[in-house]
């Protein structure tokens, strides 16, 4: 047998229930084996077929020959003073991504911020990840692997009363809807009772506005939706979020209305609005935002800008952030200020740069500009 004829083992970590059932049927096994193995992987954190004691020895041996459970490798783990935890993970081809676990409510709520791509192609002007350029999409195994790593770090069996990860937000590195074919299977695993058993309200996808894929998502899953808006007029949003030149605000919000109409329960849209000093933090910006959302059931998350080298932007003062929030309250809107978490370990929103091995021209120019300024 030559190396060319060796069949790679199937990584079971990223398989949905349907895919896992098909895999076992292809081996001549019953479909129920899929649920057994999924529970070992996602409930028990098991990566060793020999430990799966409710499978026959013959099946375990066969699985060792034909399959594997391969998650990302932890390169770095850090814990912030506020309890936020960040992992730098090595995925296939030696690329690095980051995932962040944010505790709240006395530790009862743990929200995992998950990456969908190595780097990001959107180049939003206020986001440090975008300045690193784009390398590739993550596979479904690499996406769900972030949940697997975070859950395993607690070393406890997972069930409905003991979930190390209670919420997932697809708000890490990358634009999830530009990696649709891998993000959707990963989210299905988050929702599956044989996976992580999260409710649709506890899984949130954040998008900058890839409208065709947003319409497609509404036909497949009705997870919670967040939109990275950051401006209430096209002129400013074109500057902050270049994708707006392709799908403008009106087109995006119409897609959001269609999405909410497909949800099987009453759901609100989350609007993400990064506050940047003297750019979008004045009273007329708040009034413009309120008018824009007048007929859309929504809540607003205000995110004070997190500075990074050569961004050209500044963080507004705390007083200005509070004023902006009050203006929205006075206009009848629920507006929450997202507390900066994990900034002492570069885990705060917008700081997910990581040690991404990216060779794009934009990344090279960014590095060169830093070096020139340092000279």
Curated annotation (Swiss-Prot):
Its biological purpose is as follows: Specifically methylates position 2 of adenine 2503 in 23S rRNA and position 2 of adenine 37 in tRNAs. m2A2503 modification seems to play a crucial role in the proofreading step occurring at the peptidyl transferase center and thus would serve to optimize ribosomal fidelity.
The record's subcellular location field reads: Cytoplasm
Q: Please list the reactions this protein catalyses.
A: adenosine(2503) in 23S rRNA + 2 reduced [2Fe-2S]-[ferredoxin] + 2 S-adenosyl-L-methionine = 2-methyladenosine(2503) in 23S rRNA + 5'-deoxyadenosine + L-methionine + 2 oxidized [2Fe-2S]-[ferredoxin] + S-adenosyl-L-homocysteine; adenosine(37) in tRNA + 2 reduced [2Fe-2S]-[ferredoxin] + 2 S-adenosyl-L-methionine = 2-methyladenosine(37) in tRNA + 5'-deoxyadenosine + L-methionine + 2 oxidized [2Fe-2S]-[ferredoxin] + S-adenosyl-L-homocysteine
The miscellaneous remark of the record is: Reaction proceeds by a ping-pong mechanism involving intermediate methylation of a conserved cysteine residue.
Covalent S-S links between cysteines = 113-349
What does the record's cofactor remark say about binding?
A: Binds 1 [4Fe-4S] cluster. The cluster is coordinated with 3 cysteines and an exchangeable S-adenosyl-L-methionine.
According to the UniProt entry, what is the EC number of this protein?
Answer: 2.1.1.192
Kindly state one GO CC term assigned in the UniProt record.
cytoplasm
Which residues are [4Fe-4S] cluster-binding?
A: 120, 124, 127
Q: Which family does it belong to?
A: Belongs to the radical SAM superfamily. RlmN family.
PANTHER family attached to this UniProt entry: 23S RRNA METHYLTRANSFERASE, RADICAL SAM CORE DOMAIN-CONTAINING PROTEIN
Where in this chain does the record put each Radical SAM core domain?
106-346
Spell out the InterPro entries in the cross-references. Answer: Aldolase_TIM (IPR013785), Methyltransferase_A (IPR040072), RlmN_N (IPR048641), RNA_MTrfase_RlmN (IPR027492), rRNA_lsu_MTrfase_RlmN/Cfr (IPR004383), rSAM (IPR007197)
Q: What GO annotations for molecular function exist for this entry?
A: 4 iron, 4 sulfur cluster binding; metal ion binding; rRNA (adenine(2503)-C2-)-methyltransferase activity; rRNA binding; tRNA (adenine(37)-C2)-methyltransferase activity; tRNA binding
* Gene from which this protein is expressed: rlmN
What is the protein name given in its UniProt record?
Dual-specificity RNA methyltransferase RlmN
Q: What is the originating organism of this protein? A: Chromohalobacter salexigens (strain ATCC BAA-138 / DSM 3043 / CIP 106854 / NCIMB 13768 / 1H11)
Pfam families in alphabetical order: Radical_SAM, RlmN_N
Active site per UniProt: 98 (proton acceptor), 349 (s-methylcysteine intermediate)
Q: What keywords does the record list, in alphabetical order? A: 4Fe-4S, Cytoplasm, Disulfide bond, Iron, Iron-sulfur, Metal-binding, Methyltransferase, rRNA processing, S-adenosyl-L-methionine, Transferase, tRNA processing
Checking PROSITE patterns in the record gives: RADICAL_SAM
Q: Name one GO biological process term.
A: tRNA methylation
The residues that the entry says bind S-adenosyl-L-methionine are 174-175, 206, 228-230, 306
Q: Which cofactor does it need?
A: [4Fe-4S] cluster
């Amino acid at each position: 047998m030559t190396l060319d004829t060796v069949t790679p083992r199937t990584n079971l970590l990223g398989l949905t229930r349907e895919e896992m059932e098909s895999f076992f049927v292809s081996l001549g096994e019953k479909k129920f084996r899929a649920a057994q193995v999924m529970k070992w992987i996602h409930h028990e954190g098991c990566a060793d077929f020999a430990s799966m004691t409710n499978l026959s020895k013959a099946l375990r041996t066969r699985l060792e020959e034909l399959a594997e459970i391969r998650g990302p490798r932890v390169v770095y783990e850090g814990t912030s003073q506020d309890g936020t935890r960040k992992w730098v993970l090595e995925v296939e081809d030696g690329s690095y991504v980051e995932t962040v676990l944010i505790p709240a409510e006395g530790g009862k709520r743990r929200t995992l911020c998950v990456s969908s791509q190595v780097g990001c192609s959107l180049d939003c002007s206020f986001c440090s990840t975008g300045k690193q350029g784009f390398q590739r999409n993550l596979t479904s195994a690499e996406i769900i692997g972030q949940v697997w790593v975070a859950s395993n770090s607690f070393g406890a069996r997972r069930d409905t009363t003991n979930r190390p990860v209670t919420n997932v937000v697809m708000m890490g590195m990358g634009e999830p809807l530009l990696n649709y074919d891998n993000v959707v299977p990963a989210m299905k695993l988050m929702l599956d009772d044989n996976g992580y058993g999260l409710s649709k309200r506890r899984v949130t996808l954040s998008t900058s506005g890839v409208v065709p894929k947003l319409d497609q998502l509404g036909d497949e899953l009705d997870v919670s939706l967040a939109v990275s808006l950051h401006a209430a007029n096209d002129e400013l949003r074109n500057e902050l979020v270049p994708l707006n030149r392709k799908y403008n605000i009106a087109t995006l919000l119409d897609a959001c209305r269609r999405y909410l109409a497909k949800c099987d329960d009453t759901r609100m849209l989350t609007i993400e609005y990064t506050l940047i000093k003297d750019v979008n933090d004045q009273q007329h910006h708040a009034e413009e935002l309120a008018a824009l959302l007048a007929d859309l059931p929504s809540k607003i998350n205000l995110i004070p800008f997190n500075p990074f080298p050569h961004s050209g932007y500044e963080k507004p003062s705390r007083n200005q952030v509070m004023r902006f929030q009050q203006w929205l309250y006075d206009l009848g809107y629920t507006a929450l200020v997202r507390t900066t978490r994990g900034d002492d370990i570069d885990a705060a929103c917008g700081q997910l740069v990581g040690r991404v091995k990216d060779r794009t021209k934009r990344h090279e120019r960014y590095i060169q500009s830093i070096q020139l300024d340092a000279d």
